[in-house]
Amino acid sequence: MSARSKARKRALDVLFASDVRGEDAVAALDRAIAEGEGPTNDYTATLVRGVVEHQARIDELLSSYSHGWALDRMPAVDRNVLRLGVWELLYADDVPDAVAVSEAMALVTDLSTDESPQFVNGILGSIVRNKPSLA
């Protein structure tokens, strides 16, 4: 697993745990770093902070593209994988779209339900197709 793949997994861990606990993800990240339990890859912090900074817009897009699925009805893993994927698609200029989608698919395939990969791929694919109008 590449360093960036590990960073994505760790960012997902932070976002997922914070989502389930109802706590601020950046505060959880900062606390983990202060306690020496934080990520060793700076990209993890970049991902978590980026998702939190743009979460309102990301969630708006996810609500719009997830026809018939409210965010709170999605499995928490799927919701947070999608947040990571959308952040990389829209805000990480150094990450090719295909890599962002592929990495999101790898996470959701390993960690969520059998139906989740198709769901996540469909949403991220729609966002990629409409990306020029979303910027």
From Swiss-Prot:
Keywords assigned: RNA-binding, Transcription, Transcription antitermination, Transcription regulation
GO molecular function, one term: RNA binding
One Gene Ontology biological process: DNA-templated transcription termination
Sections of the chain in a coiled coil: none
One GO cellular component term: cytosol
InterPro entries: NusB-like_sf (IPR035926), NusB_fam (IPR011605), NusB_RsmB_TIM44 (IPR006027)
Entry keyword Oxidoreductase: no
Pfam families on file: NusB
Function: Involved in transcription antitermination. Required for transcription of ribosomal RNA (rRNA) genes. Binds specifically to the boxA antiterminator sequence of the ribosomal RNA (rrn) operons.
Family: Belongs to the NusB family.
Family annotation (HAMAP family): NusB (MF_00073)
Protein name as catalogued: Transcription antitermination protein NusB
Organism annotation: Nocardioides sp. (strain ATCC BAA-499 / JS614)
